[in-house]
Amino acid sequence: MTQSLILDPLSSCPPLQIAGFDIRVLLSGNDAQAVEVFLTTGKEGTGPAPHSHPWDETFFVLRGSIVFGIGTHENSVGPGNLVHVQGGERHWYRFGDEEGEFLSFTSGKAAAAMYRELGALESNAPKTAYKAVAIRHGQESR
C-alpha cells in the first residue's frame, strides 16, 4: 500500500554504488503506484553501457554536464535540461568533465529492485554478474 511522504534523501536514502556512480532510491514501486524516482551522482566518465528496458525513463539534470546517447544520437546536456527515453529504446549516459547529478523517473516498478540488487554486488564483481542482474529485471545490453 502506498502513502504520501516527505523525505530528506541524503539522510534517509543511502546511496547504492553501482559501476562507479551512486544511485539513491527516493521513491520505489513499494511507495508509489506507477513511478519510481532516483537521485544519481557520478564522477567524470562513469555511466552505464548502452542498454534498453521496457520502462520509460526521464532524467532531469541538476548539476554538471552529462552526455546522453539515445538510439544513434548523442547530446551533452547541463543543469535544467530534461531527457526522456521511451521504454524499449537503446540509451546510455556518461558524466562529463566534473561530478554530475540528476533526478530520474521511471515508469512501473522494476528499476528500484534492479538497482538494489546491483548495489548489493561486490565492487569487483565481473561485468557478467551485473548483466545477469539486469537481464533478470528486463534490461537488455545493446
Positions of predicted regions on the chain:
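Glycine- and acidic-residue-biased ligand/ion/polar-headgroup-sensing regions
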Residues: 55-66, 71
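Ligand-binding loop in jelly-roll beta-barrel domains
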Residues: 31, 67, 79, 87-112
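A short, N-terminal "cap"/entry segment at the start of jelly-roll beta-barrel domains
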Residues: 1-34, 120-142
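Short histidine-centered beta-strand/loop micro-motifs
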Residues: 27-29, 47-53, 94-95
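Conserved short histidine dyad/triad with adjacent acidic residue
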Residues: 9, 37-52
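Short acidic-glycine-tyrosine-enriched beta hairpin
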Residues: 8-9, 60, 72-90
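A hydrophobic/aromatic-rich effector-binding and dimerization subdomain
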Residues: 103-129
